[in-house]
Amino acid sequence: MEGQKTELKIIRMSEVESQEVKWLWYPFIPYGKLTIIQGDPGDGKTTLVLNIAAKLSKGECLDSDMDVQEPVNVIYQTAEDGLADTVKPRLELAGADCEKILVIDESDKSLSMADERLEEALAKTGAKVLILDPIQAYLGGGMDMNRANEARDMTKKLGALAEKYQCAILLIGHMNKASGNKAAYRGMGSIDFFAVAKSVLLVGRIEGEPNIRAVVQIKNNLAAFGHPKAFMLSETGFRWLGDYEITADEVLGGIAPKANKLEQAKQMLRELAETTNMVQSNEIFEMADKQGISKRTLENAKKELGIQAKKINNSWYWELDAVKQR
């Protein structure tokens, strides 16, 4: 017996209304899409997302590129940590408004990615962020995440929820142990998880810096790749460091990053200041580019050294006197 025929429906692109992507954290976490945050166990993924959640609960920004106007509800599901003895103390340490951090009760039945309670919770709470940590625990008993078709169907359903409710869905995943492989293939089982997500962030240790963790974007379908970031873990808690010069290969391979580009940029400016008081900005940018220093890093070095820009005859110059006084 043949199955029921599916009705053909045609969509004319002229009838589709164009929309801009909205961002929670540009260009790392979009609204209405899936974002994967992956890394080895113990490397700080959960600490990062809990601190993001804490900031959002108070209407604050972790990073200057975040767009947070007011406190928002965050749904955080975890299968690895106790709510009372681990999750809440960590949220309190991060300064969260725990009234805004919500959890779907799994005491009667474990939650899965296909569970209708996910949509019910989004509709009821208006949460702008949903976090599943780790995603491996929310597959459901009958799903094999290494089967491409099953992974694709499951993530498409989650993606549809994100789009319908314009929330950011974050999937936290452990890396596998296939050392030397690309990050996409060291992720969460089927490559289809990686394929459906619009943004993928790698969180990992930095060789030679035991208390610092890097955040490197390894996939972005919606914008240019974001600059790598970093945060510090210590006995006193979490501290956001912002921009950091490191690559995904250095994180994955346990390779110490090349000379810190910010320090390299500051040293270049100090050496310039020894021979001149003022240099045209374009010349400085060209010098930095030859040394592999990005414009953004150079601007950060300029700010830290207290250098001022001055316009002369329609050209911009950097005054280096401040560098000599440091």
Which residues does each PLM region occupy?
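Hydrophobic positions on the alpha1 helix immediately C-terminal to the Walker A/P-loop
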Residues: 48, 52
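C-terminal regions of RecA-like/P-loop NTPase motor modules
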Residues: 1-9, 41, 123-126, 164-165, ...
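Conserved hydrophobic/aromatic pocket- or pore-lining residues that grip, position, or stack substrates
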Residues: 29, 37, 53, 76, ...
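Gly/Ala-rich phosphate-binding loop of Rossmann-like dinucleotide-binding domains
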Residues: 57
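Phosphate-binding/switch region of NTP-binding enzymes
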Residues: 36-37, 42, 47, 74-77, ...
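Conserved beta-strand segments of alpha/beta enzyme cores
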Residues: 100-102, 199, 308
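Conserved inter-motif catalytic segment of the P-loop NTP-binding fold
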Residues: 2-5, 19-20, 24-26, 30, ...
